[in-house]
Curated annotation (Swiss-Prot):
InterPro entries: Ribosomal_uL16, Ribosomal_uL16_bact-type, Ribosomal_uL16_CS, Ribosomal_uL16_dom, Ribosomal_uL16_sf. One of its GO terms (biological process) is translation. Signal peptide: none annotated. This is Large ribosomal subunit protein uL16. GO terms for cellular component: cytosolic large ribosomal subunit. Belongs to the universal ribosomal protein uL16 family. GO terms for molecular function: rRNA binding; structural constituent of ribosome; tRNA binding. The gene is rplP. Part of the 50S ribosomal subunit. Residues 1-17 have a biased composition (Basic residues). SUPFAM superfamilies: Ribosomal protein L16p/L10e. The keyword Manganese does not apply.
């Protein structure tokens, strides 16, 4: 799973996610992408589950880019522990995602295959997302 090699601080504030993504909102690498429509934290496990769903569906053809990285430590206290006594220990890593952010990109696969692969990944993520394509590319069957 993804996590930083080293960080400046062990624990982070919870914070709130305001506004839309200032950067990372356009396709930079692939022809198809998965774009976030809601703000939320996405954990390293969720990113890995989505990555596996995509790679298993495209059967290792094409190229996949993960455009988000879990760089925020999320801490929690153990169950049935009284309030106080400081902040809990870091439990997992998460990425803060704003609406409009591209989460994954795919290239080298047909549009319909990319769409189905991204739909499999959508089920693994806690936010609403949509499939986007470069100008001139189609994610639907030609009829």
């Amino acid at each position: 799973m993804l996590q930083p090699k080293r960080t400046k601080f062990r624990k982070a504030h919870k914070g709130r996610i305001h506004g839309n993504a200032p950067g990372g909102a356009s396709l930079n690498f692939g022809a198809f992408g998965l774009k976030a429509l809601e703000p939320d934290r996405i954990t390293a496990r969720q990113i890995e589950a989505a990555r596996r769903a995509i790679t298993r569906h495209i059967k290792r053809q094409g190229r996949l880019w993960i455009r988000i990285f879990p760089d925020v430590p999320v801490s929690s206290k153990p169950a049935e522990v009284r309030m106080g006594s400081g902040k809990g220990s870091p439990e997992f890593w998460a990425a803060r995602v704003k609406p409009g952010r591209i989460l994954f990109e795919l290239d080298g696969v047909p549009g319909p295959l990319a769409r189905v692969a991204f739909e499999r990944a959508m089920e693994k993520l806690p936010i609403k997302t949509k499939v986007v394509a470069r100008f001139g590319e189609s994610i639907y069957e030609d009829k």
